[in-house]
Amino acid sequence: MGDHYGFSLTTFSPSGKLMQIEYALNAVKNGQPSVGLRAKDGVVLATENVGSVLTDDQPKVEQISKHIGCVYSGMGPDFRILVKKARKIAMEYEMMYGEEMPTIQLVTDIAAVMQEYTQSGGVRPFGASLLIAGWDKNPGRPLLFQCDPSGAYFAWKATALGKNDVNAKTFLEKRFSEALELDDGIHTALLTLRESFDVGMNENNVEVAVCNSTGFHRLTKQQVHDHLGTL
């Protein structure tokens, strides 16, 4: 009977859980760590991306629209599907209304897609959680959200996903300040990421991006190298 609850997507267990969602969240917890931090003048996303020397780079940080981008922990193929859907949603909104989609509206639409995959036949939940960074022009503020496989979403000042996320969040609670500016935010995000790293951090296994009033930008390897040199 226990197997029935574990394999069924739409049947609650006696304890009130949908086990396939629990398993999807485990995929996130076993994923490479990611950190998001909201500074006064922008948002920082940082993540571990350890690949093979034999393969081309597979970025974990992706741009969705001019002022919105995201990073993930969990399963890469699932993330790429979500990014494709998010870009389509953002593009359709911009074509219809002639302006960039507000961050919160994109977050709610993507969360609705993820939730739909928890109660539909023939599919499974997405095995990835997203950290979505955005800058809304009106009233001109940075935003950071998390979307989970269940379809739940949260607004954060700072948070972490993936391996050792509890230690990373504890570190953020000690170091985060509302007064942080973007450069200090990058420094704090990298220090937090180091809490979860199994190997030495360098520009080849770390990705960093920022989102501010000028848009969403991925830092170059040289810029990442320079920031790591200040830790």
UniProtKB/Swiss-Prot annotation:
Tell me the keywords, alphabetical order: Cytoplasm, Nucleus, Proteasome
GO aspect biological process, one term: proteasome-mediated ubiquitin-dependent protein catabolic process
> In terms of domain of life, where is this protein from?
Eukaryota
Q: Does the keyword Nucleus apply?
A: yes
Q: What is its main location?
A: cytoplasm
InterPro entries given in the database record: Ntn_hydrolases_N, Proteasome_alpha, Proteasome_alpha-type, Proteasome_asu_N, Proteasome_sua/b
The terms under GO molecular function for this entry are: identical protein binding
Q: Which Pfam families match?
A: Proteasome, Proteasome_A_N
Please state where this protein is localized: Cytoplasm; Nucleus
Q: Which GO terms describe its cellular component?
A: cytoplasm; nucleus; proteasome core complex, alpha-subunit complex
Protein task: The proteasome is a multicatalytic proteinase complex which is characterized by its ability to cleave peptides with Arg, Phe, Tyr, Leu, and Glu adjacent to the leaving group at neutral or slightly basic pH. The proteasome has an ATP-dependent proteolytic activity.
* Family, similarity comment: Belongs to the peptidase T1A family.
Give the quaternary structure.
The 26S proteasome consists of a 20S proteasome core and two 19S regulatory subunits. The 20S proteasome core is composed of 28 subunits that are arranged in four stacked rings, resulting in a barrel-shaped structure. The two end rings are each formed by seven alpha subunits, and the two central rings are each formed by seven beta subunits. The catalytic chamber with the active sites is on the inside of the barrel.
UniProt protein name:
Proteasome subunit alpha type-2
Gene of this entry: pas-2
